[in-house]
Amino acid sequence: MISLRRTTTAALVACAALLAPLAPAQAGTQLPGGRPLEGRVAAFLDGIRQDPARLDAFLRQLPKGGDLHNHLSGAVSTELLIQLAAEDGLCIDSETFVSATGPCQGTARPAQDAVTDQDFRTQVIRSWSMQDFAPGQESGHDHFFATFGKFGEASWRHPGRMLAEVTDTMAAQHQSYLETMLTPASGGAAALAAKTGFDQDFAALRQRLLADGQIQTLVDQARGDLDRAMAEYQDTEHCGTAQARPGCAVTVRIQSQASRAAAPARVFTQLLLGMELASQDQRFAAVNLVQPEDYQASLDNYDLQMRMLDFLHPLYPNAHISLHAGELAPGLVKPEDLRFHIRQAVLTGHAERIGHGVDVANEDDSADLLRTLAERKVLIEVPLTSNDQILQVSGQDHPFALYRKSGVPTALSTDDPGVERIDITHEYLRAVRTYQLTYRDLKDLARTSLEYGFVGGRSLWQDRNGYRPVAECQDRPLGTKPTSACAALLRDNPKAALEWQQEGAFRDFEQAVLRGK
Protein backbone atom coordinates (compact mmCIF):
# COMPACT_ATOMS: atom_id res chain seq x y z
CA MET A 1 0.00 0.00 0.00
CA ILE A 2 2.80 2.44 0.87
CA SER A 3 6.26 1.79 -0.41
CA LEU A 4 7.51 5.06 -1.82
CA ARG A 5 10.98 5.51 -0.44
CA ARG A 6 13.86 3.40 0.76
CA THR A 7 15.82 4.29 3.86
CA THR A 8 19.58 4.78 3.78
CA THR A 9 22.39 3.36 5.87
CA ALA A 10 23.56 6.68 7.32
CA ALA A 11 22.09 5.85 10.72
CA LEU A 12 24.02 2.58 10.77
CA VAL A 13 27.32 4.38 10.46
CA ALA A 14 26.27 6.84 13.16
CA CYS A 15 26.17 4.06 15.74
CA ALA A 16 29.74 2.99 14.99
CA ALA A 17 31.17 4.87 17.96
CA LEU A 18 29.13 2.73 20.33
CA LEU A 19 30.14 -0.44 18.54
CA ALA A 20 33.79 0.37 17.90
CA PRO A 21 35.59 -0.70 21.11
CA LEU A 22 35.46 -4.43 20.39
CA ALA A 23 38.37 -6.23 18.77
CA PRO A 24 37.61 -7.56 15.26
CA ALA A 25 36.12 -11.01 14.97
CA GLN A 26 38.11 -13.64 13.10
CA ALA A 27 37.79 -12.74 9.44
CA GLY A 28 37.15 -16.21 8.10
CA THR A 29 34.20 -17.07 10.35
CA GLN A 30 31.10 -18.21 8.45
CA LEU A 31 27.83 -19.66 9.67
CA PRO A 32 26.36 -22.66 7.84
CA GLY A 33 24.58 -21.32 4.80
CA GLY A 34 25.64 -17.78 5.64
CA ARG A 35 28.15 -15.24 4.37
CA PRO A 36 31.51 -14.52 6.00
CA LEU A 37 30.13 -11.15 7.09
CA GLU A 38 27.34 -12.89 8.96
CA GLY A 39 29.72 -15.02 10.98
CA ARG A 40 31.84 -12.03 11.95
CA VAL A 41 28.78 -10.05 13.04
CA ALA A 42 27.56 -13.07 15.02
CA ALA A 43 30.85 -13.10 16.91
CA PHE A 44 30.56 -9.36 17.39
CA LEU A 45 27.11 -9.76 18.96
CA ASP A 46 28.44 -12.40 21.33
CA GLY A 47 31.07 -9.93 22.46
CA ILE A 48 28.63 -7.15 23.36
CA ARG A 49 25.90 -9.14 25.10
CA GLN A 50 26.94 -7.84 28.51
CA ASP A 51 27.24 -4.22 27.36
CA PRO A 52 23.72 -2.71 27.49
CA ALA A 53 24.49 0.45 25.52
CA ARG A 54 26.24 -1.31 22.63
CA LEU A 55 23.69 -4.13 22.58
CA ASP A 56 20.85 -1.63 22.36
CA ALA A 57 22.64 0.29 19.58
CA PHE A 58 23.26 -2.94 17.67
CA LEU A 59 19.64 -4.08 17.90
CA ARG A 60 18.25 -0.63 17.13
CA GLN A 61 20.05 -0.63 13.77
CA LEU A 62 19.29 -4.29 12.99
CA PRO A 63 16.79 -4.70 10.12
CA LYS A 64 13.73 -6.15 11.84
CA GLY A 65 11.26 -6.96 9.08
CA GLY A 66 7.64 -6.31 9.93
CA ASP A 67 5.24 -5.87 12.83
CA LEU A 68 2.39 -8.33 12.32
CA HIS A 69 0.46 -7.68 15.54
CA ASN A 70 -0.33 -4.03 16.02
CA HIS A 71 -3.43 -2.12 17.12
CA LEU A 72 -3.30 1.40 15.70
CA SER A 73 -5.04 3.13 18.60
CA GLY A 74 -2.73 1.40 21.07
CA ALA A 75 0.37 1.84 18.93
CA VAL A 76 0.38 5.63 18.80
CA SER A 77 2.15 7.49 21.59
CA THR A 78 0.12 8.84 24.49
CA GLU A 79 1.68 12.23 23.84
CA LEU A 80 0.19 12.37 20.34
CA LEU A 81 -3.22 11.33 21.67
CA ILE A 82 -3.07 14.20 24.16
CA GLN A 83 -2.09 16.60 21.39
CA LEU A 84 -4.96 15.42 19.18
CA ALA A 85 -7.42 15.67 22.07
CA ALA A 86 -6.33 19.25 22.70
CA GLU A 87 -6.55 20.21 19.03
CA ASP A 88 -10.05 18.73 18.81
CA GLY A 89 -11.25 20.64 21.88
CA LEU A 90 -11.95 17.52 23.93
CA CYS A 91 -12.24 17.25 27.68
CA ILE A 92 -10.51 14.87 30.10
CA ASP A 93 -12.14 14.05 33.42
CA SER A 94 -9.71 14.82 36.24
CA GLU A 95 -10.94 11.85 38.28
CA THR A 96 -11.63 9.09 35.74
CA PHE A 97 -9.34 10.44 32.98
CA VAL A 98 -11.93 9.53 30.36
CA SER A 99 -11.84 11.74 27.27
CA ALA A 100 -15.09 13.20 25.96
CA THR A 101 -16.48 15.94 23.76
CA GLY A 102 -17.22 19.31 25.32
CA PRO A 103 -18.38 21.39 26.99
CA CYS A 104 -16.09 20.58 29.92
CA GLN A 105 -18.19 20.60 33.07
CA GLY A 106 -17.77 19.43 36.66
CA THR A 107 -14.56 17.45 37.05
CA ALA A 108 -13.82 17.56 33.31
CA ARG A 109 -10.89 19.71 32.23
CA PRO A 110 -9.98 20.88 28.73
CA ALA A 111 -7.53 18.45 27.15
CA GLN A 112 -5.37 21.48 26.46
CA ASP A 113 -4.59 21.47 30.20
CA ALA A 114 -2.70 18.21 29.66
CA VAL A 115 -0.45 20.12 27.26
CA THR A 116 0.30 23.05 29.58
CA ASP A 117 -0.06 21.60 33.12
CA GLN A 118 2.78 19.13 33.73
CA ASP A 119 1.20 17.49 36.79
CA PHE A 120 -2.09 16.89 34.97
CA ARG A 121 -0.19 15.72 31.89
CA THR A 122 1.68 13.12 33.95
CA GLN A 123 -1.59 11.90 35.47
CA VAL A 124 -3.14 11.53 32.02
CA ILE A 125 -0.13 9.70 30.62
CA ARG A 126 -0.17 7.28 33.55
CA SER A 127 -3.90 6.69 33.10
CA TRP A 128 -3.70 6.28 29.32
CA SER A 129 -0.67 3.98 29.35
CA MET A 130 1.38 1.58 31.47
CA GLN A 131 3.90 4.27 32.44
CA ASP A 132 4.91 3.89 36.11
CA PHE A 133 2.21 1.26 36.65
CA ALA A 134 2.56 -0.90 39.75
CA PRO A 135 -0.02 -3.63 40.48
CA GLY A 136 -2.15 -2.96 43.52
CA GLN A 137 -5.90 -2.72 43.73
CA GLU A 138 -5.84 -2.66 39.92
CA SER A 139 -4.12 -5.46 37.99
CA GLY A 140 -1.94 -4.91 34.96
CA HIS A 141 -4.61 -6.66 32.89
CA ASP A 142 -7.34 -4.29 34.04
CA HIS A 143 -5.26 -1.12 33.78
CA PHE A 144 -4.03 -2.05 30.30
CA PHE A 145 -7.45 -2.68 28.81
CA ALA A 146 -9.01 0.28 30.63
CA THR A 147 -6.73 2.69 28.79
CA PHE A 148 -8.64 2.22 25.54
CA GLY A 149 -11.88 3.39 27.08
CA LYS A 150 -10.14 6.42 28.54
CA PHE A 151 -8.43 7.73 25.42
CA GLY A 152 -10.99 6.32 22.99
CA GLU A 153 -12.61 9.65 22.09
CA ALA A 154 -9.20 11.03 21.14
CA SER A 155 -8.17 8.09 19.00
CA TRP A 156 -10.50 7.92 16.00
CA ARG A 157 -10.56 11.31 14.26
CA HIS A 158 -7.03 11.37 12.83
CA PRO A 159 -6.00 7.85 11.78
CA GLY A 160 -3.65 9.20 9.11
CA ARG A 161 -1.65 11.28 11.56
CA MET A 162 -1.56 8.37 13.97
CA LEU A 163 -0.34 6.02 11.26
CA ALA A 164 2.31 8.55 10.29
CA GLU A 165 3.79 8.51 13.78
CA VAL A 166 3.69 4.71 13.90
CA THR A 167 5.40 4.22 10.54
CA ASP A 168 8.03 6.87 11.29
CA THR A 169 8.83 4.99 14.49
CA MET A 170 9.02 1.73 12.57
CA ALA A 171 11.32 3.20 9.94
CA ALA A 172 13.61 4.44 12.71
CA GLN A 173 13.65 0.86 14.02
CA HIS A 174 14.54 -0.42 10.53
CA GLN A 175 11.23 -2.15 9.88
CA SER A 176 9.62 -2.12 6.46
CA TYR A 177 6.17 -3.71 6.83
CA LEU A 178 3.17 -3.12 9.09
CA GLU A 179 -0.14 -4.85 9.57
CA THR A 180 -2.30 -2.75 11.85
CA MET A 181 -5.81 -3.43 13.13
CA LEU A 182 -8.79 -1.13 12.58
CA THR A 183 -12.55 -1.50 12.94
CA PRO A 184 -13.97 -0.60 9.51
CA ALA A 185 -17.31 1.21 9.29
CA SER A 186 -17.82 0.54 12.98
CA GLY A 187 -21.03 2.51 13.49
CA GLY A 188 -22.62 1.29 10.29
CA ALA A 189 -21.80 -2.33 11.05
CA ALA A 190 -23.30 -2.02 14.54
CA ALA A 191 -26.47 -0.47 13.15
CA LEU A 192 -26.85 -3.12 10.44
CA ALA A 193 -26.31 -5.90 12.99
CA ALA A 194 -28.96 -4.44 15.30
CA LYS A 195 -31.40 -4.13 12.41
CA THR A 196 -30.77 -7.63 11.04
CA GLY A 197 -30.48 -9.59 14.27
CA PHE A 198 -28.84 -12.99 14.62
CA ASP A 199 -29.57 -16.36 13.10
CA GLN A 200 -27.71 -19.61 13.76
CA ASP A 201 -28.26 -20.36 10.08
CA PHE A 202 -25.16 -18.53 8.90
CA ALA A 203 -26.01 -18.86 5.20
CA ALA A 204 -29.40 -17.25 5.71
CA LEU A 205 -27.90 -14.54 7.91
CA ARG A 206 -25.25 -13.74 5.33
CA GLN A 207 -27.85 -13.42 2.59
CA ARG A 208 -29.91 -11.01 4.71
CA LEU A 209 -26.84 -8.87 5.34
CA LEU A 210 -25.86 -8.88 1.66
CA ALA A 211 -29.41 -8.10 0.50
CA ASP A 212 -30.06 -4.72 -1.11
CA GLY A 213 -26.36 -3.93 -1.07
CA GLN A 214 -26.29 -3.39 2.67
CA ILE A 215 -22.83 -4.88 3.26
CA GLN A 216 -21.57 -3.39 0.01
CA THR A 217 -22.58 0.04 1.31
CA LEU A 218 -20.39 -0.58 4.36
CA VAL A 219 -17.56 -1.84 2.15
CA ASP A 220 -17.72 1.37 0.13
CA GLN A 221 -17.81 3.42 3.33
CA ALA A 222 -14.81 1.60 4.80
CA ARG A 223 -12.80 2.00 1.61
CA GLY A 224 -13.66 5.69 1.51
CA ASP A 225 -12.66 6.06 5.16
CA LEU A 226 -9.31 4.45 4.39
CA ASP A 227 -8.85 6.66 1.32
CA ARG A 228 -9.29 9.73 3.53
CA ALA A 229 -7.02 8.32 6.23
CA MET A 230 -4.31 7.61 3.68
CA ALA A 231 -4.65 11.08 2.18
CA GLU A 232 -4.12 12.51 5.67
CA TYR A 233 -1.22 10.11 6.15
CA GLN A 234 0.50 11.04 2.91
CA ASP A 235 -0.04 14.74 3.56
CA THR A 236 1.48 14.39 7.04
CA GLU A 237 4.41 12.35 5.73
CA HIS A 238 4.91 14.35 2.50
CA CYS A 239 5.08 11.07 0.63
CA GLY A 240 6.12 11.37 -3.00
CA THR A 241 7.94 14.65 -2.43
CA ALA A 242 11.53 15.62 -1.77
CA GLN A 243 10.53 16.12 1.88
CA ALA A 244 9.12 12.60 2.30
CA ARG A 245 9.42 11.36 5.85
CA PRO A 246 10.93 7.92 6.63
CA GLY A 247 7.55 6.30 7.29
CA CYS A 248 6.69 6.56 3.59
CA ALA A 249 9.03 3.60 3.03
CA VAL A 250 6.92 1.31 5.22
CA THR A 251 4.43 -0.93 3.40
CA VAL A 252 1.10 -0.99 5.25
CA ARG A 253 -1.77 -3.45 5.26
CA ILE A 254 -4.96 -3.37 7.35
CA GLN A 255 -6.54 -6.13 9.40
CA SER A 256 -10.29 -5.69 9.90
CA GLN A 257 -11.05 -6.39 13.53
CA ALA A 258 -14.28 -7.73 15.01
CA SER A 259 -15.20 -7.19 18.65
CA ARG A 260 -15.38 -10.65 20.21
CA ALA A 261 -17.20 -9.45 23.35
CA ALA A 262 -20.03 -7.95 21.29
CA ALA A 263 -23.34 -9.64 20.54
CA PRO A 264 -23.16 -12.47 17.96
CA ALA A 265 -25.03 -10.47 15.32
CA ARG A 266 -22.43 -7.74 15.46
CA VAL A 267 -19.49 -10.15 15.43
CA PHE A 268 -20.82 -11.94 12.36
CA THR A 269 -21.53 -8.66 10.58
CA GLN A 270 -18.03 -7.38 11.30
CA LEU A 271 -16.42 -10.62 10.16
CA LEU A 272 -18.47 -10.65 6.97
CA LEU A 273 -17.56 -7.03 6.29
CA GLY A 274 -13.88 -7.81 6.84
CA MET A 275 -14.06 -10.77 4.47
CA GLU A 276 -15.73 -8.68 1.78
CA LEU A 277 -13.14 -5.94 2.18
CA ALA A 278 -10.25 -8.38 1.84
CA SER A 279 -11.83 -9.72 -1.33
CA GLN A 280 -12.32 -6.30 -2.91
CA ASP A 281 -9.38 -4.18 -1.74
CA GLN A 282 -5.84 -5.50 -1.29
CA ARG A 283 -5.16 -2.89 1.39
CA PHE A 284 -7.45 -4.88 3.68
CA ALA A 285 -5.52 -8.11 4.11
CA ALA A 286 -7.16 -10.08 6.91
CA VAL A 287 -9.73 -10.38 9.67
CA ASN A 288 -9.09 -10.70 13.39
CA LEU A 289 -10.98 -10.89 16.68
CA VAL A 290 -10.07 -8.37 19.37
CA GLN A 291 -11.05 -7.46 22.95
CA PRO A 292 -10.02 -9.48 26.00
CA GLU A 293 -10.31 -13.20 25.45
CA ASP A 294 -11.18 -13.66 29.14
CA TYR A 295 -14.30 -11.47 29.08
CA GLN A 296 -17.33 -13.60 29.82
CA ALA A 297 -18.99 -12.87 26.49
CA SER A 298 -15.75 -13.83 24.71
CA LEU A 299 -15.63 -17.13 26.58
CA ASP A 300 -19.32 -17.89 26.14
CA ASN A 301 -19.24 -17.26 22.39
CA TYR A 302 -15.78 -18.60 21.54
CA ASP A 303 -17.00 -21.78 19.85
CA LEU A 304 -19.75 -19.86 18.05
CA GLN A 305 -17.26 -17.35 16.66
CA MET A 306 -14.94 -20.10 15.43
CA ARG A 307 -17.87 -21.68 13.63
CA MET A 308 -18.65 -18.32 12.02
CA LEU A 309 -15.13 -18.27 10.62
CA ASP A 310 -15.43 -21.88 9.54
CA PHE A 311 -18.50 -20.92 7.52
CA LEU A 312 -17.03 -17.76 5.99
CA HIS A 313 -13.54 -19.05 5.21
CA PRO A 314 -14.33 -21.11 2.06
CA LEU A 315 -16.51 -18.30 0.71
CA TYR A 316 -13.68 -15.77 0.88
CA PRO A 317 -10.42 -17.54 0.00
CA ASN A 318 -8.55 -14.24 -0.45
CA ALA A 319 -9.25 -13.13 3.12
CA HIS A 320 -6.47 -14.11 5.50
CA ILE A 321 -7.23 -14.96 9.13
CA SER A 322 -5.11 -14.09 12.14
CA LEU A 323 -6.65 -14.61 15.56
CA HIS A 324 -5.95 -13.57 19.10
CA ALA A 325 -5.98 -16.92 20.90
CA GLY A 326 -4.44 -18.16 24.10
CA GLU A 327 -4.02 -14.67 25.58
CA LEU A 328 -4.83 -16.34 28.86
CA ALA A 329 -3.05 -17.60 31.95
CA PRO A 330 -3.94 -19.78 34.94
CA GLY A 331 -5.98 -17.83 37.44
CA LEU A 332 -7.39 -15.42 34.88
CA VAL A 333 -10.08 -17.90 33.80
CA LYS A 334 -11.22 -21.28 35.03
CA PRO A 335 -8.98 -24.22 33.99
CA GLU A 336 -11.47 -25.50 31.41
CA ASP A 337 -11.09 -22.30 29.39
CA LEU A 338 -7.36 -22.84 29.00
CA ARG A 339 -7.74 -26.18 27.25
CA PHE A 340 -8.78 -25.49 23.64
CA HIS A 341 -8.69 -21.90 22.36
CA ILE A 342 -5.52 -22.12 20.25
CA ARG A 343 -6.41 -25.51 18.78
CA GLN A 344 -9.92 -24.42 17.88
CA ALA A 345 -8.67 -21.16 16.37
CA VAL A 346 -6.52 -23.19 13.98
CA LEU A 347 -8.68 -26.23 13.26
CA THR A 348 -12.10 -24.53 13.20
CA GLY A 349 -11.30 -20.84 12.80
CA HIS A 350 -8.70 -21.48 10.05
CA ALA A 351 -6.19 -19.13 11.66
CA GLU A 352 -2.99 -18.83 9.65
CA ARG A 353 -1.39 -16.91 12.49
CA ILE A 354 -2.04 -16.80 16.22
CA GLY A 355 -1.60 -13.68 18.31
CA HIS A 356 -0.14 -14.34 21.79
CA GLY A 357 -0.66 -18.11 22.22
CA VAL A 358 0.54 -17.82 25.82
CA ASP A 359 -1.43 -20.68 27.33
CA VAL A 360 -0.32 -23.35 24.84
CA ALA A 361 1.12 -25.60 27.55
CA ASN A 362 -2.28 -25.66 29.27
CA GLU A 363 -4.13 -26.92 26.21
CA ASP A 364 -5.25 -30.52 25.91
CA ASP A 365 -2.41 -32.65 24.50
CA SER A 366 -0.18 -29.63 24.06
CA ALA A 367 2.57 -31.74 22.46
CA ASP A 368 0.19 -32.73 19.67
CA LEU A 369 -0.96 -29.13 19.32
CA LEU A 370 2.63 -27.95 18.95
CA ARG A 371 3.22 -30.58 16.26
CA THR A 372 0.09 -29.39 14.46
CA LEU A 373 1.21 -25.77 14.59
CA ALA A 374 4.66 -26.72 13.29
CA GLU A 375 3.32 -28.93 10.50
CA ARG A 376 0.78 -26.35 9.37
CA LYS A 377 3.32 -23.52 9.64
CA VAL A 378 1.01 -21.46 11.84
CA LEU A 379 2.97 -18.42 12.96
CA ILE A 380 2.82 -17.20 16.56
CA GLU A 381 2.90 -13.41 16.93
CA VAL A 382 4.86 -12.85 20.16
CA PRO A 383 4.55 -9.53 22.04
CA LEU A 384 6.72 -10.26 25.09
CA THR A 385 6.13 -7.02 26.99
CA SER A 386 2.38 -7.11 26.43
CA ASN A 387 2.24 -10.67 27.79
CA ASP A 388 4.19 -9.58 30.85
CA GLN A 389 2.11 -6.47 31.52
CA ILE A 390 -1.29 -8.09 30.96
CA LEU A 391 -0.77 -11.71 32.03
CA GLN A 392 2.37 -11.47 34.18
CA VAL A 393 3.92 -14.20 32.04
CA SER A 394 7.57 -13.66 31.18
CA GLY A 395 11.03 -15.20 31.05
CA GLN A 396 11.16 -18.97 31.18
CA ASP A 397 7.43 -19.09 31.99
CA HIS A 398 6.70 -17.69 28.54
CA PRO A 399 6.26 -20.27 25.73
CA PHE A 400 8.47 -18.39 23.24
CA ALA A 401 11.33 -20.86 23.69
CA LEU A 402 8.91 -23.81 23.66
CA TYR A 403 7.47 -22.73 20.32
CA ARG A 404 10.94 -22.33 18.83
CA LYS A 405 12.11 -25.69 20.16
CA SER A 406 8.99 -27.30 18.67
CA GLY A 407 9.62 -25.85 15.22
CA VAL A 408 6.65 -23.46 15.35
CA PRO A 409 7.38 -20.25 13.42
CA THR A 410 7.49 -17.14 15.60
CA ALA A 411 7.84 -13.41 15.06
CA LEU A 412 8.30 -10.69 17.64
CA SER A 413 5.64 -7.98 17.64
CA THR A 414 4.63 -4.94 19.68
CA ASP A 415 0.83 -5.28 20.15
CA ASP A 416 0.17 -1.81 21.63
CA PRO A 417 3.55 -0.10 21.91
CA GLY A 418 2.05 3.29 22.77
CA VAL A 419 0.20 1.88 25.75
CA GLU A 420 3.15 -0.31 26.73
CA ARG A 421 5.66 2.55 26.29
CA ILE A 422 8.00 0.37 24.24
CA ASP A 423 9.20 -0.15 20.67
CA ILE A 424 10.20 -3.20 18.63
CA THR A 425 13.87 -2.80 19.58
CA HIS A 426 12.80 -3.24 23.19
CA GLU A 427 11.21 -6.56 22.25
CA TYR A 428 14.33 -7.77 20.43
CA LEU A 429 16.47 -6.67 23.36
CA ARG A 430 14.22 -8.51 25.78
CA ALA A 431 14.36 -11.65 23.64
CA VAL A 432 18.15 -11.56 23.29
CA ARG A 433 18.71 -11.09 27.01
CA THR A 434 16.16 -13.68 28.09
CA TYR A 435 16.62 -16.41 25.49
CA GLN A 436 20.26 -15.92 24.39
CA LEU A 437 19.32 -15.56 20.74
CA THR A 438 22.11 -15.71 18.17
CA TYR A 439 22.57 -13.33 15.27
CA ARG A 440 21.17 -15.99 12.92
CA ASP A 441 18.15 -16.30 15.23
CA LEU A 442 17.57 -12.55 14.98
CA LYS A 443 17.83 -12.54 11.20
CA ASP A 444 15.44 -15.44 10.94
CA LEU A 445 12.92 -13.74 13.23
CA ALA A 446 13.01 -10.70 10.96
CA ARG A 447 12.77 -12.84 7.83
CA THR A 448 9.86 -14.79 9.28
CA SER A 449 7.94 -11.59 10.01
CA LEU A 450 7.95 -10.78 6.29
CA GLU A 451 7.49 -14.35 5.06
CA TYR A 452 4.29 -14.74 7.09
CA GLY A 453 3.00 -11.25 6.38
CA PHE A 454 -0.26 -11.04 4.47
CA VAL A 455 1.28 -9.09 1.60
CA GLY A 456 0.59 -10.35 -1.88
CA GLY A 457 2.68 -12.29 -4.34
CA ARG A 458 5.29 -15.01 -4.32
CA SER A 459 8.00 -15.27 -1.73
CA LEU A 460 11.71 -14.81 -2.33
CA TRP A 461 12.21 -18.17 -0.61
CA GLN A 462 11.67 -21.64 -2.03
CA ASP A 463 9.62 -22.76 0.96
CA ARG A 464 9.12 -22.08 4.64
CA ASN A 465 11.62 -24.70 5.79
CA GLY A 466 14.63 -22.44 5.36
CA TYR A 467 15.76 -19.31 3.65
CA ARG A 468 16.92 -20.59 0.27
CA PRO A 469 16.11 -18.22 -2.60
CA VAL A 470 13.96 -19.26 -5.54
CA ALA A 471 15.73 -20.22 -8.76
CA GLU A 472 15.22 -16.81 -10.39
CA CYS A 473 17.23 -15.08 -7.66
CA GLN A 474 20.10 -17.50 -7.01
CA ASP A 475 22.66 -16.03 -9.42
CA ARG A 476 23.50 -12.86 -7.49
CA PRO A 477 24.17 -12.14 -3.81
CA LEU A 478 20.89 -11.45 -2.04
CA GLY A 479 19.96 -7.80 -1.81
CA THR A 480 22.33 -6.63 -4.53
CA LYS A 481 21.42 -5.70 -8.11
CA PRO A 482 19.20 -8.57 -9.29
CA THR A 483 19.43 -10.42 -12.57
CA SER A 484 16.74 -9.67 -15.15
CA ALA A 485 14.82 -12.82 -14.17
CA CYS A 486 14.99 -11.94 -10.49
CA ALA A 487 14.09 -8.31 -11.17
CA ALA A 488 10.96 -9.49 -12.98
CA LEU A 489 9.99 -11.60 -9.98
CA LEU A 490 10.54 -8.69 -7.61
CA ARG A 491 8.57 -6.32 -9.82
CA ASP A 492 5.51 -8.56 -9.88
CA ASN A 493 5.57 -9.84 -6.29
CA PRO A 494 5.47 -7.32 -3.43
CA LYS A 495 6.38 -9.93 -0.81
CA ALA A 496 9.51 -11.01 -2.64
CA ALA A 497 10.45 -7.36 -3.16
CA LEU A 498 10.20 -6.65 0.57
CA GLU A 499 12.29 -9.72 1.34
CA TRP A 500 14.96 -8.81 -1.21
CA GLN A 501 15.07 -5.29 0.21
CA GLN A 502 15.60 -6.71 3.69
CA GLU A 503 18.47 -8.90 2.51
CA GLY A 504 20.13 -5.78 1.15
CA ALA A 505 19.50 -4.06 4.48
CA PHE A 506 21.18 -6.97 6.29
CA ARG A 507 24.21 -6.62 4.03
CA ASP A 508 24.40 -2.86 4.66
CA PHE A 509 23.98 -3.41 8.40
CA GLU A 510 26.73 -6.02 8.59
CA GLN A 511 29.15 -3.91 6.61
CA ALA A 512 28.41 -0.85 8.76
CA VAL A 513 28.89 -2.80 12.00
CA LEU A 514 32.23 -4.19 10.88
CA ARG A 515 33.41 -0.82 9.56
CA GLY A 516 32.79 0.56 13.03
CA LYS A 517 35.21 -1.83 14.70
Predicted regions and their residues:
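Secretory targeting and sorting signals
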Residues: I2-A27
